[in-house]
Amino acid sequence: TAANSSSLNDGAAAVVVMSKEKAEELGVTPKMKIEGYAIAGFDAELMGYSPKFSSEKLANKLGVDLKSIDMFEINEAFASQAYAVSRDLGLDPEKVNIYGGGISIGHPIGATGAMLTVKVMYELMRTDKKDAMISMCIGGGQGISMYFTKCE
């Protein structure tokens, strides 16, 4: 319903991804490092829940304890979906979507990954937080997660 789902909005975000060597060559100061990503699928009938599985898969792949990560941005297509993912991962609510998710700030279709990446980048840059994970639900019962660390 309109009260618990994200609205469709215009919006944009951009990210530039390059190797450390290329950044040095261009004189660009890296802000974050992509440590890894994972994709998982689940029953498409349970829309939006697969980020739980992609986040667990990524944490296992990298040997990272989810509870030790400083912040999370979870795509909030629906309040119940984002809440269920966060709850079932056992995440501290104070670390999840700390400036609001898709319901409060909108959900421009096709910009989710870049927007979540930019949100965590700015939070890592302005605080002493060291790492972040983003995740989103994608079509057909899939989820994708990416883990970043701050470049010092």
Where are these regions (language model features)?
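Claisen-condensing/thiolase-fold acyl-transfer catalytic domains that form or cleave C-C bonds
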Residues: 1-152
